[in-house]
Amino acid sequence: MDFSNFLCIEQELKLIALLVILFLYDTFCSKEWKKYFQNIAIVGFAIVIISEFPPYFTMYGEAFGGIHISSQLTFFMKSILNVATFLVFLQANKWLSSEKMLLRQGEFYVIMLISLLGMYFMISAENFVMLYIGMETASLPLACLVAFDKYQEKSAEAAVKYILTSALSSGVMLFGLSFLYGSLGSFYYSDIALNIVSSPLVKLGFVFFFGGLGFKLSLVPFHLWTADVYEGAPTSVTAYLSVVSKGAATFALIFVLYKVFGRIELIWNNILCWLLLATIVLGNLFAIRQQNIKRFFAFSSISQAGYILLGIIAGTAQGMTSTIFYTLVYLFSNLAAFGVIASVEYQTNGDTRIVSFNGLYRSNPGLAFVMMLAVFSLGGIPPFAGFFSKFFIFMAAAEQKQYILVFIALLNTVMSLYYYLLIVKAMFIEKRGEVVLEKIGIDNYNRISMVICTIGIFVIGFLSAIYEYIETISFGVLQK
């Protein structure tokens, strides 16, 4: 076997090496040494991330018979997922340090890294079989993570819902892939892109395939699992689902639509337009009436997926660039919010109702400030990064004369400000009554994560070099 194949999977090999080390440490170390596991996992993953820059030994190109591809773009996408996962690790520290979780830390980190490895394969796939294997490798560990807090009934219930809907989406995707293979005779992206025709079988195959991937993105009508799973899962797992899992699905969808189905753009463009409208509108409408903060962010996440579709619908290099940039900004904004949620939830013994945030500013002004920045960025209020990411998305769609979609998206952006400001109102204006929320002790790891997210929210929008870099490395992906 050619050794250059392994140079093309440098990121995967480093992650596998860390996985093996953590697994062996957790398996063979004594209980006295288990207390150091978190530090080893966090520092080890940080070393893996840092060691990838600059990528001296990474070789770009196809590997293992063309089923895997590495490029500057895939490297950057995986790096985005790495940063998001690292921030989730930091935020999970206090929860995993509790007495009931102390001996289960190893399981949490190993399972989450296995899921991340599957997402690597989804991004680098050049073959639909590879994409499916990556998706399943990512999904099965996620079901374990959703049920990780076995002492909570909602966690087990959420896991069952996630497993059932995930299995259904996998079956639907395989059904679609069977149509594509039957009509085109190949699973390779390049072969399908070369021979694809607008036949009824291809159209049907695409619809079923997209339905399976739409589950990962929580697009309407594939979103029914989202609110219950987000509410029932441990908060750190919810953060991972809303950012890392959604990001991997977004990146995989970009490659499939632009590289494989670029020649039948008119077909998938029409489908995505209707899904976009339903996703943005229903996500916003249901978010308004939520009383639980995690369900609130579940529907917020659904509506945010609609903006991602708007960038993809543009079908241009600018549209793809703005979609990737939007995902990067969404990472910092959403994880900043979940860092605050995790802290408040721990202090209030698992209370995730929005009213539990009443008067947060009076006792914990720092946390209230971070949450305010997060929801302002998610709502697209200038001068935060979320404003610039939405602006680029709207510009990309407007350049392709998608004026109606842009107008509806703008209206829904204004609508979203109402429910985002409800959180700000609860923290800064509402009073808690007789029960006063004590000052929350934030551990150093979570504090670091929120500082990183805050810097990202403030700075990324003004760094045009990041957008330009994404535009540069995205060159050549479009196949029409």
Curated annotation (Swiss-Prot):
It catalyses: a quinone + NADH + 5 H(+)(in) = a quinol + NAD(+) + 4 H(+)(out). GO terms for cellular component: plasma membrane. Pfam families: Proton_antipo_M. It comes from the Bacteria. Keywords: Cell inner membrane, Cell membrane, Membrane, NAD, Quinone, Translocase, Transmembrane, Transmembrane helix, Transport. Belongs to the complex I subunit 2 family. NDH-1 shuttles electrons from NADH, via FMN and iron-sulfur (Fe-S) centers, to quinones in the respiratory chain. The immediate electron acceptor for the enzyme in this species is believed to be a menaquinone. Couples the redox reaction to proton translocation (for every two electrons transferred, four hydrogen ions are translocated across the cytoplasmic membrane), and thus conserves the redox energy in a proton gradient. This is NADH-quinone oxidoreductase subunit N. It comes from Azobacteroides pseudotrichonymphae genomovar. CFP2.
